[in-house]
Amino acid sequence: MNAGSENSTPRISEPASPLAQAVHIGDYRPRLRIGEYGTVASVGDGIAWVTGLPSAAMDDVLMFEDGSWAVVFALTKKRIGAVLLHQSENLTAGTPARLAGRTLDVPVGETLLGRVIDPIGNPLDGGRPLETRNRRPLDSPSPPIIARDFVQQPLYTGTRLVDTLVPIGKGQRQLIIGDEGTGRSSLAIDAVLNQKGREVRCVYVLIGQKRSTVVGTIELLRNYGALAYTTVVVGEAGSLPGLKYLAPFAGCAIAEDWMARGHDTLVVYDDLSTHAQTYRELSLLLRRPPGREAYPGDIFYLHARLLERATALNPANGGGSMTALPIVETRLGEIEAYIPTNLISITDGQIYLDSDLFAAGFKPAIDVTRSVSRIGGKAQHPRIKEEAGRMKLDYLQFLELEIFTRFGARLESGMEARIRRGRLLREILRQERLQPLPPEFQLAWMTAYNEGLLDAMPPGSVQHALNELNSALRNGSPPLEASRTDWLTWLRQNLPEPARGEA
């Protein structure tokens, strides 16, 4: 074999001598690693029962050998009940389990704007993984009383009826309640769309919704430019019950982080009826004692703990706010049911959507007589509050008078004029979805109505006149702080001819 072939032959290292091996063994220092390991006893319906792990505590994260993981949800003397958050096909009885040494948290921060995620922070929009080191616990204590401030700033939803008669303030918790198909989600989506350009960051939480509904909502937000300042948290109908249960807490934690940084936020929980049903399902599977309507006894505490985190912080704590719009479904208009009454007592007011009004074509189908905002009026702009008070009185009197006309009762001429104006007002309050309106427009039409500038218009043409008025507003109008005289002067110059002529 020549020299070239010797150089090309790979060299094999010689084994270490026995003396060298002895030196290495002598240097070795054993380090004991102590850990707890358990075993899956049974698994099914999104629940895993685990034996062992004596130091496990509530809300601890469990890791399974096959890659699945769960969160501790029930503790008994012999077993641990865990709610699965990721389940592989290989998870079976006998799979080893261990404690992860942490509790549940979710990524937070600027990178979440415009993203669609699941409740544990995994992207669902096909985008790149979230690049943030900031995380926040899903379940954290609500801000203390000393850190809170009064609700003082209005949050405009863009809906005529809401911004005038049932106003909402930043930091308020306002329930949206009604039967299925009455426009509850549409009202919340309009509120999100109206935050464009208002420096309000939004979180829309979809709980137990069908995939088609989820996709439709996301596309709607994207098409109207609202996804740029919104994060969507999805626990869809086909996902594990644990993900549906955690969805509102994840959305709240994301908004809570922005609030702590001094931003105004809006959170929509769509909807908490499904969330309550999911919690009931998990509780029954974990063999917790059932209470009224088979819900566990702490269902009220669960939702109160979630919604109490929405507030307005004082300037010393950043001055941010979190406004919550929880949605709840009723059946056949029964607002006295268990979950609706719970949420009514927790929140600061409710917007009730009536199925009869919806069937009659009045949209949004808000029943003013059963809707209330307990603290929103304090945050309402003084000029809007002044005009809304006069208009609301007229509308409520009209609703009472209209009942008598159904029995064929004869009315005096003054009463007939009131009914005529009331029907005109009802037509004004109609509004198509996805058409949020600025507060200046709300003040303009209420001032015009209260002054009688619209009385000459037939109800069928008043919407066209209001559209022209809104177009004129875009070209310039007095500020909200302007006097009533200034607004009346501007209205007489910009209202369509029929109204201006009669004025």
From Swiss-Prot:
<keyword id="KW-0067">ATP-binding</keyword>
<dbReference type="GO" id="GO:0005524">
    <property type="term" value="F:ATP binding"/>
</dbReference>
<dbReference type="Pfam" id="PF00006">
    <property type="entry name" value="ATP-synt_ab"/>
</dbReference>
<keyword id="KW-0066">ATP synthesis</keyword>
<keyword id="KW-0472">Membrane</keyword>
<comment type="subunit">
    <text>F-type ATPases have 2 components, CF(1) - the catalytic core - and CF(0) - the membrane proton channel. CF(1) has five subunits: alpha(3), beta(3), gamma(1), delta(1), epsilon(1). CF(0) has three main subunits: a(1), b(2) and c(9-12). The alpha and beta chains form an alternating ring which encloses part of the gamma chain. CF(1) is attached to CF(0) by a central stalk formed by the gamma and epsilon chains, while a peripheral stalk is formed by the delta and b chains.</text>
</comment>
<dbReference type="Pfam" id="PF00306">
    <property type="entry name" value="ATP-synt_ab_C"/>
</dbReference>
<comment type="function">
    <text>Produces ATP from ADP in the presence of a proton gradient across the membrane. The alpha chain is a regulatory subunit.</text>
</comment>
<dbReference type="InterPro" id="IPR005294">
    <property type="entry name" value="ATP_synth_F1_asu"/>
</dbReference>
<dbReference type="InterPro" id="IPR033732">
    <property type="entry name" value="ATP_synth_F1_a_nt-bd_dom"/>
</dbReference>
<keyword id="KW-0813">Transport</keyword>
<dbReference type="GO" id="GO:0046933">
    <property type="term" value="F:proton-transporting ATP synthase activity, rotational mechanism"/>
</dbReference>
<keyword id="KW-0547">Nucleotide-binding</keyword>
<keyword id="KW-0406">Ion transport</keyword>
<protein>
    <recommendedName>
        <fullName>ATP synthase subunit alpha 2</fullName>
        <ecNumber>7.1.2.2</ecNumber>
    </recommendedName>
</protein>
<dbReference type="InterPro" id="IPR000194">
    <property type="entry name" value="ATPase_F1/V1/A1_a/bsu_nucl-bd"/>
</dbReference>
<feature type="site" description="Required for activity">
    <location>
        <position position="371"/>
    </location>
</feature>
<dbReference type="InterPro" id="IPR020003">
    <property type="entry name" value="ATPase_a/bsu_AS"/>
</dbReference>
<dbReference type="InterPro" id="IPR000793">
    <property type="entry name" value="ATP_synth_asu_C"/>
</dbReference>
<dbReference type="GO" id="GO:0005886">
    <property type="term" value="C:plasma membrane"/>
</dbReference>
<keyword id="KW-0139">CF(1)</keyword>
<dbReference type="InterPro" id="IPR023366">
    <property type="entry name" value="ATP_synth_asu-like_sf"/>
</dbReference>
<keyword id="KW-0375">Hydrogen ion transport</keyword>
<dbReference type="InterPro" id="IPR038376">
    <property type="entry name" value="ATP_synth_asu_C_sf"/>
</dbReference>
<dbReference type="InterPro" id="IPR036121">
    <property type="entry name" value="ATPase_F1/V1/A1_a/bsu_N_sf"/>
</dbReference>
<keyword id="KW-0997">Cell inner membrane</keyword>
<comment type="similarity">
    <text>Belongs to the ATPase alpha/beta chains family.</text>
</comment>
<keyword id="KW-1278">Translocase</keyword>
<dbReference type="InterPro" id="IPR027417">
    <property type="entry name" value="P-loop_NTPase"/>
</dbReference>
<keyword id="KW-1003">Cell membrane</keyword>
<dbReference type="GO" id="GO:0043531">
    <property type="term" value="F:ADP binding"/>
</dbReference>
<dbReference type="GO" id="GO:0045259">
    <property type="term" value="C:proton-transporting ATP synthase complex"/>
</dbReference>
